């Protein structure tokens, strides 16, 4: 039976149905990286730009990348500190993949603002 994806093949966040997964074809480590993650500072409401790296050691499931792209775009207008955002992403990816926290690593690098770059890893 062919698996159907909600996000794949659809434009924009209207197709967002959560983080979608597919059966692990046998890989032991997956790394996904995006430089399209944005959020806003919860204090100043100024935009923050991130490079996000998600590395996980799959068991039964892998993340479908288009659903991840749409998932990350949902943070665009949300206020969040870098550190809290890293934890939230790790927790939601962990839940979608049905893994333990130690099987998922998330690193966010917040691009410099005011001369300071922040890196948060969980």
Which ranges hold each PLM region?
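N-terminal intrinsically disordered, cationic/polar leader segments
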Residues: 1-122
């Amino acid at each position: 039976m062919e698996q159907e994806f909600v996000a794949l093949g659809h434009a924009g966040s209207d197709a967002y149905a959560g983080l979608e997964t597919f059966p692990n074809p046998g890989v032991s480590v997956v790394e996904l990286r995006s430089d399209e993650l944005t959020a806003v500072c919860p204090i100043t409401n100024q935009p923050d730009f991130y490079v996000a790296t998600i590395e996980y050691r799959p068991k039964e499931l892998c993340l479908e990348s288009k659903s991840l792209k749409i998932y990350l775009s949902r943070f665009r207008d949300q206020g969040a500190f870098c550190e809290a955002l890293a934890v939230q992403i790790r927790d939601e990816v962990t839940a979608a993949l049905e893994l333990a926290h130690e099987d998922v690593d998330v690193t966010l690098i917040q691009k410099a603002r005011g001369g300071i770059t922040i890196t948060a890893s969980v």
